[in-house]
Amino acid sequence: MSNRNNRRPILIPIAGVFLALAVASHLASPSRPSRSTSAIYAETNQIKVVEEGDMCLPNTVLASLQAAIPTRQSVVGGDVVPIRSVEDSYYSLHSVSVDPMNNRVVMTDANRGGILFYDITSGNKTSAVTDPLWHIRGPATGMMFVAGVATDPRRREVFTVDNDIGDRMMVFPYDVDGNVKPKRVLSVPHGAWGLALNLQRDEIAISIEHPNIVAVFKRDAMGLEAPKRVIHGPHAGLEDPHGIVFDAAADEILVANHGNWAPLDREEAGEGDETIPGRFDPPSITSYPGEAVGDAKPTRTIQGSQTHLNWPMGMSLDALHDEIVVANYGDNSVLVFHRADNGNVAPVRVIRGEQTGILGPMGVAIDTQNDELWVTNYRDHSAVVFSRTATGNIAPKRIVRNAPPGTPAVGFGNPGAIAYDSKRKEILVPN
């Protein structure tokens, strides 16, 4: 068959898309000088020299297309080591719980996904790193971005929840180490942050950030078991809840709120003139009866400029001295209030300043037996221990370090995306 009737399609892969090009062939002419050009064979990504009259492309177009085709050497796949990475190889301490009955302090590591057990006397004033007694971590644990923690001294159990991605509460026994499976796993609403046990009620309360709820479960709930009751609604005062305590003696639930609220769904948002908009309010600490359910209004609210609340995180209750302690992440401080405070009230004590060693406080815990206050630093690879009544710009009694002093903390908080600023040549990582 002549070249006039011999036409072949050529497929060219560019950026993973196959573009079919059909180009008509030229008539063979003996008076025309013979020229050669190139064709791309899609099966091999190779260039082959062909004579005029065969299927061909202009050389300028061909060169551009050839440059866009990845070579076999440039294709990456399999178990490949990255060129470089930004990561924190040390623990980032999140929440803390003290158990004087068993002489234990338990902390969660949000960075590498684990639970750390320390002796209650751990720490020193040197630059030495303090190794944990036990460290639960590994794929079998199911832990991811670990947040709140609570301990049951009688049953020697530790409870923790995954924030943002795991949507699970996991329960482990004391004194286990390594890559171990949890005793129990409970599915919880998305965005769980804080935990609070009430052993008298045999219940555990969980603060859920995004839908602005507090869910109360049986202590031993597991699987897909539903909560016994839920506090939620436009009048409940729950606005991005984080820290939570369950006051067994007063039968109250206390919650630290960042101040952001939005309707959970269309039904709650309403329609037309009855639409309820989202809002940004000042941070607060709200209190509820232990049996509160639904859109229950708080019985008390600590809120206002005098409170100095600024991104309140973890909370701890000192029932013996009628005080509540709050980790105030926004200005690297710890605030202490009377348990029954209400309104725009100033804290009883404030620990803040360069000497305190507080940097990105995420969790707090009161040890009334040893008269001490524990604070976990999310941005400093450390936990600092103060006298319970410490105030002002005061140095801690002890420091529990998991990295040498001055080691920078990457500060990732479950990054969900990445972008590159070509003007400033910076990598942007929203958390």
What are these regions (language model features)?
Residues S2-G16:
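N-terminal Sec-pathway targeting helices
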Residues N59, S89, V98-P100, M107-R112, ...:
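Conserved beta-strand positions in repeat-built beta-propeller and related beta-rich domains
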Residues E87-N102, P139-R155, V188-E203, P234-A249, ...:
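Beta-rich, blade/repeat-based domains predominating
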Residues I12-H26:
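Hydrophobic membrane-insertion alpha-helices, especially the h-region
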Residues P33-D79, K125-T126, D295:
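Blade/loop signatures of beta-propeller domains
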